[in-house]
């Protein structure tokens, strides 16, 4: 401390002796000279600061502050790196999920297309079956109508023939026909 105090004191004294204030006023080394008193007070203040090691305390505090800032920076750097790795991981997962979603959508579209085609084929087959059933019903109804018409025509023809035969045939001819029918039936049965 004395090593620093002596050169500082000598510099202050030289600066004080060479100052223009000394040339303008009376003797510099007098307690009546305010410049001298201020200089002495300043030197005493500096000496007290050095005696109580205030510069080293300030330096230590600044060093601690610098270390704290450096540790904060290191922690922030680590957090930033972790955040970047998490971001990269999430981006990879998002790309994977997007790929899976695209694949699911493509599969669903493909399945929907196949289902639509199958439904179309099934609908065409159903229409063909219904058309065939309708045609069968029409043919059956037509056949039934034709049979009904034939049966009525036969019944009308038999009734008309019976009327014609009954009106034109005599009782002897009718008995002769009945006997021939019985004989014919008997021959066919035996």
Curated annotation (Swiss-Prot):
Purpose: F(1)F(0) ATP synthase produces ATP from ADP in the presence of a proton or sodium gradient. F-type ATPases consist of two structural domains, F(1) containing the extramembraneous catalytic core and F(0) containing the membrane proton channel, linked together by a central stalk and a peripheral stalk. During catalysis, ATP synthesis in the catalytic domain of F(1) is coupled via a rotary mechanism of the central stalk subunits to proton translocation.
Stretches that traverse the bilayer: 4-24
Gene Ontology CC: plasma membrane; proton-transporting ATP synthase complex
Subunit description: F-type ATPases have 2 components, F(1) - the catalytic core - and F(0) - the membrane proton channel. F(1) has five subunits: alpha(3), beta(3), gamma(1), delta(1), epsilon(1). F(0) has three main subunits: a(1), b(2) and c(10-14). The alpha and beta chains form an alternating ring which encloses part of the gamma chain. F(1) is attached to F(0) by a central stalk formed by the gamma and epsilon chains, while a peripheral stalk is formed by the delta and b chains.
Annotated membrane topology: Single-pass membrane protein
Keyword Glycoprotein applies: no
Family membership noted in the UniProt record: Belongs to the ATPase B chain family.
One Pfam match: ATP-synt_B
A molecular-function term among this protein's GO annotations: proton-transporting ATP synthase activity, rotational mechanism
Main location: membrane
Protein name in UniProt: ATP synthase subunit b
Domain of life: Bacteria
PANTHER family: ATP SYNTHASE SUBUNIT B, ATP SYNTHASE SUBUNIT B', CHLOROPLASTIC
Compartmental location: Cell inner membrane
Keywords, alphabetical: ATP synthesis, Cell inner membrane, Cell membrane, CF(0), Hydrogen ion transport, Ion transport, Membrane, Transmembrane, Transmembrane helix, Transport
């Amino acid at each position: 401390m004395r090593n620093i105090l002596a050169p500082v004191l000598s510099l202050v004294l030289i600066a004080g002796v060479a100052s223009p204030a000394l040339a303008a006023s009376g003797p510099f080394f007098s307690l009546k000279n305010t410049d001298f008193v201020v200089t002495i007070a300043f030197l005493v203040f500096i000496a007290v600061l050095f005696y109580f090691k205030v510069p080293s305390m300030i330096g230590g505090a600044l060093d601690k502050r610098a270390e704290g800032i450096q540790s904060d920076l290191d922690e922030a750097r680590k957090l930033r790196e972790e955040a970047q790795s998490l971001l990269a991981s999430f981006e990879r997962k998002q790309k994977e999920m997007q790929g899976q979603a695209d694949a699911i959508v493509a599969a669903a579209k493909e399945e929907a297309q196949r289902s639509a085609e199958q439904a179309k084929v099934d609908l065409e087959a159903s229409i063909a079956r219904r058309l065939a059933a309708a045609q069968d019903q029409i043919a059956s109804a037509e056949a039934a109508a034709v049979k009904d018409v034939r049966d009525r025509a036969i019944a009308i023809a038999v009734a008309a023939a019976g009327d014609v035969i009954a009106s034109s045939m005599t009782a002897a001819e009718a008995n002769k026909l009945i006997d021939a029918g019985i004989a014919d039936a008997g021959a066919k049965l035996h």
